[in-house]
Amino acid sequence: MSVLTNPSLLLLRNSEKLVGKSILVVNFVQDGFLAELKKRNPESKITAFSYNHANGEFAKNTPGVDVCVNHCISGNDFDLVILYYPKSKPEVLMALDNIRAVITADAELLVVGENKSGVKSIEKQLTDKANFSNKIDSAKHCVLYSFAELKQLSQFNISDYHKPFTVSVADSEFTAISIPGVFNHGNLDVGTKILLENAPLIKQGTVLDFGCGAGLIATYLGLQNPALSFVCSDVSALAIYATTQTLKLNNIKGEALLSDGLTNITGKFDLIISNPPFHTGIATDYTVAETFLANAKQHLTKAGKLNIVANSFLKYPPILEAQFDNYQTVFKNNKFAVYSS
């Protein structure tokens, strides 16, 4: 058995509940749970859904499990749904609505999560959406709930969850589209604003917006320099969807790609610009950003530049120094720093 996370261990110690003809696992984690679930349901159809491309890549070769990474769940016949509770409450509310549009009338919903994820809010969140609820078990700082007689929805339309918002940087203003689960949902964060205020001026070429979120960086630069073309990447299918909507709304030419770090990125760029992520799920995780910085140079043209913003306390300068002959700190205050190669 692969190493299992505490939420998965809690599910498996209640294995009598893990039975269904068509089982959907939402927001699964990178452990051995899907394989264990298939062992207990060898004849069942099991679908594993995630918004996260890295999780999808981890699980894609699990025998007997269909893995889907997308911005919404499709189907209509799931009689058991297992939801790993996400840290974003707007995201969980959207996911619950999506789930209620793809289940059978007699479906059961199991919700598991760590206490620190906010999972105990689930009973309140489903008060008017399920007629029956039960706290099944708790252990290892995790809780498992069961819900039945869920109120089905006839359809799910992600456009109902669009959140348009205005982005103002320097003398530029535009409208962006966000959806739940996207970084800093519905707002321009301070770090990205500082990055854009200190972005280099390039007249033409191709730009990589790494960790694109709602596509704010590419849109701002594209409005400043219409000759630029963009590749926007993110590990989140929700971010890719939001970026696509924002680019389209502002007539910016570019493509949005799912990628775990730089793994799906090809070619070289005249500018790589990013507010790189340092959270994975609930936990703080610098691995993605550090790996990105260590490998960004090979994706730059000879005269290409790297521009990033980071919290001032993060130890990125030694990594930059190891990769680039010269880099500059173009902005720094007590919270943020902008680095340029």
Curated annotation (Swiss-Prot):
Top-level class of the enzyme under EC nomenclature: transferase
Keyword rRNA processing: yes
Keyword Hydrolase: no
Chief localisation class: cytoplasm
Compartment annotation: Cytoplasm
EC code: 2.1.1.172
Gene Ontology terms, MF aspect: 16S rRNA (guanine(1207)-N(2))-methyltransferase activity; nucleic acid binding
Keyword tags: Cytoplasm, Methyltransferase, rRNA processing, S-adenosyl-L-methionine, Transferase
CC per GO annotation: cytoplasm
PANTHER family given in the database record: RIBOSOMAL RNA SMALL SUBUNIT METHYLTRANSFERASE C
Family statement: Belongs to the methyltransferase superfamily. RsmC family.
Assembly, per entry: Monomer.
Protein name: Ribosomal RNA small subunit methyltransferase C
Organism: Pseudoalteromonas translucida (strain TAC 125)
